[in-house]
Structures are given as structure tokens and as C-alpha cells.
């Protein structure tokens, strides 16, 4: 029997996943948590083998939570976003799988079985995005803006240097941050210096 925990701040997602997993004779959902803090308090000692964890939660992000979960538990990250940068971030943080919230029931079940037996699971569409995302995900202009932001330049300075309007620089900044899965200039600089 493979024991599973669900961590998601949306009750309907947890309930739906629990019902789907409960239909499988070798899977048992033994814990459900509505927040990262609840999971940290309730997971230890439950003997959970596989954890399905949402990335976007209000108290602690799933990526932050990943490093604090009990050792020996295989974690599948779950998100509505599946940009290559976000998937890579999750895998680098120790996730053994990544599912989009648009995944099929069969993909959910396959992911749990795969990570429970030591494998890594990505749906084919995410794997393709990840493989193609290993090429530079940014346009030439987005890369220029990213490099300037990482050097600490202000938007107005970047606009003047590249011959763009500040509004255009803001658009490039928003696009590149979404593509790289970062939310501020500090995270962006860290990604730049780590070689993406």
C-alpha cells in the first residue's frame, strides 16, 4: 500500500485528488493539509511515502516547504503554471515529479506510482517544454533587460541605455520573470549568476 499526503490550500483540489487516488486499490490518502504550516505540524510520524504539494499557497510556498518536509518522502509538485523554469526550480529543490493542475486522472496515478518506486515523473507536455526550455527561454531583448536588472540598474536607466520606453522595459521585465519563475529582482539576479 502506497501512503499519500495532499497539501493544497483549495479544498476542492484536495477532495478531487483524494477521491481519484482512493479508487486505486494500492493507494491510500492518509493525510490532507490546507496549508504549508499545517503540513509541517501534521506530516512527521505519519509514514507518508508520497506527498502531492501545491506550489502556490498563501503561507509557505510549496518550493520553500519542500526542503522542510520529512526525509524519505517522494514529493510531486503541483501547479497551474508549468513553465520550464518553474519545473526546473522544483526538481532542483528535490521534487521527484511535477504535475499541472490540468493533468488527467491517469497521469496523477502514474505519477504517484512512479515516484513511490524511486522514479521521476513529468507529463509528456511538461517534459517537452522542459527540453525545449533548456534552450534560452528569453528573447534577445528580454535577456538584455534581465542582465541590466541583475546588475542593479533601474528601469529608467535600462530604457535610456536600450532606447526603449520605461513601459516597454516593464513589459519585458514581467515577461522574463514569468518565464524564469521568479517574482523579484533579487531572485532574478540569483538566477542570472547561477547561469539560469
UniProtKB/Swiss-Prot annotation:
GO terms for molecular function: DNA binding. Residues 155-174 bind DNA. The modification 4-aspartylphosphate is found at residue 54. InterPro entries: CheY-like_superfamily, Sig_transdc_resp-reg_C-effctor, Sig_transdc_resp-reg_receiver, Tscrpt_reg_LuxR_C, WalR-like. SUPFAM superfamilies: C-terminal effector domain of the bipartite response regulators, CheY-like. Residues 3-116 form the Response regulatory domain. Phosphorylation by UhpB enhances DNA binding activity. It is found in: Cytoplasm. It holds the Pfam family GerE. The keyword Transcription regulation applies. Keywords: Activator, Cytoplasm, DNA-binding, Phosphoprotein, Transcription, Transcription regulation, Two-component regulatory system. CDD domains: LuxR_C_like (cd06170), REC_NarL-like (cd17535). Residues 131-196 form the HTH luxR-type domain. PANTHER family: TRANSCRIPTIONAL REGULATORY PROTEIN UHPA, TWO-COMPONENT RESPONSE REGULATOR. This is Transcriptional regulatory protein UhpA. It comes from Escherichia coli (strain K12). The lineage of its organism: Bacteria, Pseudomonadati, Pseudomonadota, Gammaproteobacteria, Enterobacterales. The gene is uhpA.
Amino acid at each position: 500500500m502506497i501512503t499519500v499526503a495532499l497539501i493544497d490550500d483549495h479544498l476542492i483540489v484536495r477532495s478531487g485528488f483524494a477521491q481519484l487516488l482512493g479508487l486505486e486499490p494500492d493507494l491510500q490518502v492518509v493525510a490532507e493539509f490546507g496549508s504549508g504550516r499545517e503540513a509541517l505540524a501534521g506530516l512527521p510520524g505519519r509514514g507518508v511515502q508520497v506527498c502531492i504539494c501545491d506550489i502556490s499557497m498563501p503561507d509557505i510556498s510549496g518550493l520553500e516547504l519542500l526542503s522542510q518536509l520529512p526525509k524519505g518522502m517522494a514529493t510531486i509538485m503541483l501547479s497551474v503554471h508549468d513553465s520550464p523554469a518553474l519545473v526546473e526550480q522544483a526538481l532542483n529543490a528535490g521534487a521527484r515529479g511535477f504535475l499541472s493542475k490540468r493533468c488527467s486522472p491517469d497521469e496523477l496515478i502514474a505519477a504517484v506510482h512512479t515516484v513511490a518506486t524511486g522514479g521521476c515523473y513529468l507529463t509528456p507536455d511538461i517534459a517537452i517544454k522542459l527540453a525545449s526550455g533548456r534552450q534560452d527561454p528569453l528573447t534577445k531583448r528580454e535577456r538584455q533587460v534581465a542582465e541590466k536588472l541583475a546588475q542593479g540598474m533601474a528601469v529608467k536607466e535600462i530604457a535610456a541605455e536600450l532606447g526603449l520606453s520605461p513601459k516597454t522595459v516593464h513589459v519585458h521585465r514581467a515577461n522574463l520573470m514569468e518565464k524564469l519563475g521568479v517574482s523579484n529582482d533579487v531572485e532574478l539576479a540569483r538566477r542570472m549568476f547561477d547561469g539560469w
